[in-house]
Amino acid sequence: VGSEMCIRDSTGAALLDAIVLAVVSREDEGTYGYKITQDVRKAIDVSESTLYPVLRRLQKGEYLEVYDRQFDGRNRRYYKVTETGRTQLIMYRKEWKEYSGKINELFEGGILE
């Protein structure tokens, strides 16, 4: 429950967007919701009911495109990172590097100016 609470603030929402974009970007042809959930859960404890609104938000922002593909006689919805999404992911990676560096400095005894 602790990590669920943590990801609800604005930093957490951006972090969750970044993690989802990173997971989806690993597959050139895109990937489907259940697999995205499983892969994200390798990093943080998050429910499907939390992730699907993130996928919709990323789609609405044109960071992800969506298409259906047949699987075992039914349609499976796939998500794929757009060029806009790739640009956003690059920015998220840069911000994460700076942010995590500052946090590491704090953990190791304070930020040096």
What are the roles of these predicted feature ranges?
Residues G61-N75, K80:
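Beta-hairpin "wing" of winged helix-turn-helix
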Residues V1-I7:
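Short, small-residue-biased leader/transition segments that mark boundaries at the very start
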Residues G2, L15, R76:
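Short coil/loop residues immediately preceding or within conserved phosphate-binding loops
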Residues P53, R57:
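Alpha-helical DNA-recognition elements
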Residues I90-E113:
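Amphipathic alpha-helical dimerization/coiled-coil segments
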Residues R8-Y52:
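N-terminal helix-turn-helix DNA-binding core of bacterial DNA-binding proteins
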